[in-house]
């Protein structure tokens, strides 16, 4: 298992919401936990993954996601079991929609 940490610049999401969880930890899938944190200018991301050596891929996927969604001020905790970048984007989008109550 590899543990990665990122701080990503994004537009702030200004909602007072309870934490949410989306997805499941299973083969080819991942779980996303979304909560707020006190730094309004960055999104904190922690990734625990079974796929070792893909930090650059995670960085690219997360940067692209943060450009499409306002996520600064949030903490994203991802528990991954080999999800593809497309599945990561899907789960992140679902988790943010759930957090926003959409």
Curated annotation (Swiss-Prot):
GO cellular component entries: cytoplasm
Domain of life: Bacteria
Keyword Aminoacyl-tRNA synthetase attached: no
Record keywords, A-Z: Cytoplasm, Phosphoprotein
Molecular-function GO terms, alphabetical: acyl carrier activity
Residues that bear O-(phosphoribosyl dephospho-coenzyme A)serine: 27
Post-translational changes noted in the entry: Covalently binds the prosthetic group of malonate decarboxylase.
Pfam families, alphabetized: ACP (PF06857)
Keyword field contains Cytoplasm: yes
Compartment(s): Cytoplasm
Function according to Swiss-Prot or TrEMBL: Subunit of malonate decarboxylase, it is an acyl carrier protein to which acetyl and malonyl thioester residues are bound via a 2'-(5''-phosphoribosyl)-3'-dephospho-CoA prosthetic group and turn over during the catalytic mechanism.
Family: Belongs to the MdcC family.
UniProt-recorded name of the protein: Malonate decarboxylase acyl carrier protein
Source species: Acinetobacter calcoaceticus
């Amino acid at each position: 298992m590899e543990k990665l940490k990122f701080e990503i610049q994004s537009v702030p999401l200004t909602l007072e919401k309870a934490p949410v969880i989306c997805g499941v930890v299973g083969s080819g899938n991942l779980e996303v936990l979304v909560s707020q944190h006190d730094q309004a200018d960055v999104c904190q991301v922690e990734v625990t993954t079974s796929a070792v050596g893909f930090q650059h891929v995670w960085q690219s996927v997360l940067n692209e996601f943060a450009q499409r969604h306002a996520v600064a001020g949030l903490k994203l905790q991802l528990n991954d079991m080999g999800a593809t970048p497309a599945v990561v984007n899907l789960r992140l989008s679902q988790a943010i929609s759930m957090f926003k109550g959409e």
